[in-house]
Amino acid sequence: MCIRDRVTNIEGNEHIWYDPAALDEVAGNIADQINELNTDAHASTERVDSHVDRLRDKLKELPGDLSYAQTEPIADYIMKYTSGKDVTPEGYRKATISEGEPTAADLAAFTKAIKDHKVDLLIFNPQTETDTAGRIKSAAEDADVNIVEIGETPPDGKEFWTYYDEVTDSLGKL
């Protein structure tokens, strides 16, 4: 069975490695294949399951009335496990999901939402920072909006699980 058959696909979003369901599915498929090739291997997903369960629990504890926006759709697969509401302006989101540049109107809508206190949390990807994303981050800083940085890959020297734990810990401090 293909991963996409059991994992929710968010249209146009390639950041599936942040989806706990995808992590479970990949680990299960790898363990199954190892055990098929070598019946003495006894490959298990126990460690992955433990990490994933902890991540899901932390995400479920985020405030229910949280409104968030993203400078790039890096956290869709993380935030789908929360009851928070994505308030990223639609035009801005469409531009970034297709790897395009948002219009001046999209930027204005985003900064207005921040200034009007409609955004509790800004999710910012420092690894894909553009001038537009930097301006949005500055507007969020000026408005005292919480900012959580989530990169596409862990910083140098940091392994995935440690980084993912740090990301969910940062979200949990809101």
Question: For each predicted feature, which ranges?
Answer:
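Extracytoplasmic metal-acquisition and chelation regions
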Residues: 3-174
